[in-house]
Amino acid sequence: MNITFIGSGYVGLVSGIIMGYLGHNVTCLDNDEVKISKLNKQILPIYEAKLDEYLKQALEANRLKFTNIYNNELQNAEAIFITVGTPSKESGEADLKYVYDAIDKVSEHINKDCLIVIKSTVPPDSCSNIIAYLKSKGFSFNVASNPEFLREGSAVEDFLYPDRIVVGVNNKESEEILRKIYAPLIEQGAKFVVTDLVTSELIKYASNSFLATKIAFINEMADLCEKIGGNIEDLSKGVGLDQRIGQNFLNAGPGFGGSCFPKDILALNNLVENHHIDCKILKAVIKSNKQRPSNMVDKIATLLDGDLKGKNIAVLGLTYKAGTDDVRASPAIEIVKILLNKDVYVKAFDPIGLENAKKNLEHKNLLYLDSVAEACKSVDIIVIATEWLEFKELNWQGIYDLVKFPIVIDLRNIIDNEAMKKIGFRYYAVGSKLDVIPAKAGIHYKAR
């Protein structure tokens, strides 16, 4: 089928490339001329495992092209996917200005039988409002909802092997077009969930908010384990092996971040408040997660006798999770900001996200470095803030020889505690008791 994606950000780009790989004729349209120019040279603006391979295959098969021009070629499209951003307003409400801008532009060019598919995350009733908006301008296009459930870092696999494909429609014609588009995935067993427009839109918000709730809950259980001597890793396993609960999103850490969870739970909370529903769970999760980076800094301070001023701290990992270069709403970045406000000197490293971090945060006391060794040299403490595999596989003996004080606080619980202790590190994970030994007790340190 002939498909166009409006917006070549994370969702539009991954979806467009894989749709081209699956055999559709795909056009990805974006206002950013520089981005489009790079894409035509096979230069991806995002990091996503294996995406470059599928980009190459789709281009070589002549099933994918990139443009920044809205023109009458759009008349050939059988479906237009809107995949633009929906950032949060100050109130927490989703801002749909980019969605409506895209609708205005495509409606002037597409044919009357073209299906407009809203893949951007939008509040319930958005599709119905778009239909009414189009009718007010003299258009009668079918509009469908098709939320995405891609996880950054594993988006290619998520698209090719989805848990489910959700579509919201108000007529059979729209459903049949979407079934045809997703036929390659349905044929291999993907569940195709058909519902109404409002429910489809709400499924995305409810899914992300529920997952965010799991993360906030396990983080608070980690705090309890820290106080009473429990083992958060065993607790997560023991709880998660219950099939009613599942093990995913039960990893204690510095909180959730990224472009979806924080934004979507705020939008859902705004929605329920607008309908005069007091959803205490959502408010509690938002509050808990907002406090989490500060709580992590408090733990760091505790390990340094409560005095952070003037300390040199290595922060390993800046992206909100491993497998992506995305630093949006990253807990690691928030932790760095708090440390800088406390007159700490921060030396930061990330294997993929350094450039995005530099665009996001600059400070006279912040150094971005190109290796773990450079970041750890002569520091008072090492903070592991993102769960990159390379941190787990580091030559920690070599790092021990570089640091001023051999203290590691692992906010992702990825390092082997006993192995670190054998080397000589004082190692602390989230959920472990902080048995504080004053830094001035030199017998526990090898001052550099």
Swiss-Prot record:
Keywords: NAD, Oxidoreductase. The keyword Oxidoreductase applies. NAD(+) binds at residues 2-19, 30, 35, 121, 152, 263, 328. Substrate binds at residues 148-152, 204, 208, 249-253, 257, 321. One of its GO terms (molecular function) is UDP-glucose 6-dehydrogenase activity. It is an enzyme of class 1 (oxidoreductase). Belongs to the UDP-glucose/GDP-mannose dehydrogenase family. PANTHER family: UDP-GLUCOSE 6-DEHYDROGENASE TUAD. This is UDP-glucose 6-dehydrogenase. It comes from Rickettsia felis (strain ATCC VR-1525 / URRWXCal2). The lineage of its organism: Bacteria, Pseudomonadati, Pseudomonadota, Alphaproteobacteria, Rickettsiales.
